[in-house]
């Protein structure tokens, strides 16, 4: 008799369906690295990862996972996490220093306060009419 060769799936099941794979090569474009066990879309596996032995399908967790590669990936991931934490701490201290410098540049250092000299205008000065001499004017 005839057997069904295709399964009719809805758009939701196609969109959410993932397959479990172990990556055998680095794929930084997809943020997948050697030894990593990941759930990816079947199309990604078919079109990119499976080519040239870049990844393998995992059908049973006990037998198909290469534990040596997985341990290498876990040590690499731990090292990268430590480096990332150190980098973030350095970045945070640099940001704090920059903020302090900006505050100092905006608000300025505490300047030595000089006594302000009052501007003496013409009306404020003690000049009287007797002191002013205008040629040709006799008072």
Swiss-Prot record:
GO terms for cellular component: mitochondrial inner membrane; mitochondrial large ribosomal subunit; mitochondrion. GO terms for molecular function: structural constituent of ribosome. Residues 83-121 are annotated as: Disordered. GO terms for biological process: mitochondrial translation. InterPro entries: Ribosomal_bL9_N_sf (IPR036935). It comes from the Eukaryota. Its main location: mitochondrion. Signal peptide: none annotated. Keywords: Mitochondrion, Ribonucleoprotein, Ribosomal protein. It is found in: Mitochondrion. Component of the mitochondrial ribosome (mitoribosome), a dedicated translation machinery responsible for the synthesis of mitochondrial genome-encoded proteins, including at least some of the essential transmembrane subunits of the mitochondrial respiratory chain. The mitoribosomes are attached to the mitochondrial inner membrane and translation products are cotranslationally integrated into the membrane. Belongs to the bacterial ribosomal protein bL9 family. Component of the mitochondrial large ribosomal subunit (mt-LSU). Mature yeast 74S mitochondrial ribosomes consist of a small (37S) and a large (54S) subunit. The 37S small subunit contains a 15S ribosomal RNA (15S mt-rRNA) and 34 different proteins. The 54S large subunit contains a 21S rRNA (21S mt-rRNA) and 46 different proteins. This is Large ribosomal subunit protein bL9m. It comes from Saccharomyces cerevisiae (strain ATCC 204508 / S288c) (Baker's yeast).
